[in-house]
Each structure stands twice: as structure tokens, then as C-alpha cells.
Amino acid sequence: MGVYTYENEFTSDIPAPKLFKAFVLDADNLIPKIAPQAVKCAEILEGDGGPGTIKKITFGEGSHYGYVKHKIHSIDKVNHTYSYSLIEGDALSENIEKIDYETKLVSAPHGGTIIKTTSKYHTKGDVEIKEEHVKAGKEKAAHLFKLIEGYLKDHPSEYN
């Protein structure tokens, strides 16, 4: 089994606490509302929403995938960190066992946020991850993030 790690960093004008509430704490409600073509719904299968929780995300008609299951490892509301694993679903290829994700939102000096993400692809055997697979995932995540950011700018009184 191999582990391939990819890091990404980008910025937002939205303050970290507000962005964390929308992007992490209320994503299961917000994303289907603003991007139903991407995510149809999210449901908790086990747990209370905290560490150990297993969620099923059902994708919308605009997606190439049907569903995925996430297992939440940690949610830190004070330090604005979140980690989970993608453990099941058709977004995992036959060569990938799971993908671990870590997200940290850091308050930027200008009042916005620096978003730092780490993705760890756990492969089966000696399979290598193709760069275009990772790039496609990053582009989809960036697009979804921009939708959330746009929603927060259009609705400044929400998630305070």
C-alpha cells in the first residue's frame, strides 16, 4: 500500500469563524441548497455528527458519482480544523482504499482566511495516483468553495 500526500492552500475574504460554520459545520445543509446539481443530500448513518460519525453524501444529477461515505475523525471549532476519511463510494477507484482529508482555516492578517488542505490517498498495492485525478478533485472542491464563499458574500448576516 502506498500513501500519496497532496497539499493545497488558498485564501478567502470571509473571516475564518464564519467560513468554518458554513464550510464545515453546516455543509450538509448549505451545499445541497446552493449546489443541488453537485450534492443532492447528506445524511448521518452512525453517530452524532462528531468524531466517529459516518455520513453518506448522495451526489446530484450533475455529478459523475452516485455517493460516498465519510468517517469524521475530528472537528475543532476553536482552532477551525476538520479531518475525515472518504471510506466508501464510487468516487474511490478500484486502486484506492481510502482518502484522508485535513482542513485548517487560519485567520489571515487582512481579516480573511487562509485555507490549508491536505489529502492523503491510500492506494492498494503499488498503484500510483495520476496527477489528473487529484487535479480534477481539487478543481471540483475549489468550485464548490467559491459557491459557498459567494453565498456568504450575498448573505452577510448568516453564519455569524
Swiss-Prot record:
Question: Function, please?
Answer: Involved in the control of flavonoid biosynthesis in fruits, probably by binding directly to natural flavonoids. Binds the natural flavonoid quercetin-3-O-glucuronide with affinities in the low micromolar range.
The remark listed among the other comments is: Fruits silencing FRAA3 exhibit loss of pigmentation in mature fruits due to the lack of anthocyanin biosynthesis.
Gene Ontology CC? cytoplasm; nucleus
- Give the domain of life: Eukaryota
- PANTHER family (UniProt xref): OS08G0374000 PROTEIN-RELATED, STRESS-INDUCED PROTEIN SAM22
Q: Which cysteines are joined by disulfide bonds?
A: none
Keywords for the protein's UniProt record, in alphabetical order: Allergen, Flavonoid biosynthesis, Pathogenesis-related protein, Plant defense
The record describes its quaternary structure and partners as:
Monomer. Interacts with AP.
Which InterPro entries does the UniProt entry name for this protein? Bet_v_I/MLP (IPR000916), Bet_v_I_allergen (IPR024949), Plant_def-hormone_signal (IPR050279), START-like_dom_sf (IPR023393)
Tissue expression: Highly expressed in roots. Expressed in open flowers. Expressed at low levels in leaves, flower buds and fruits.
**Annotated protein name in UniProt:** Major strawberry allergen Fra a 1-E
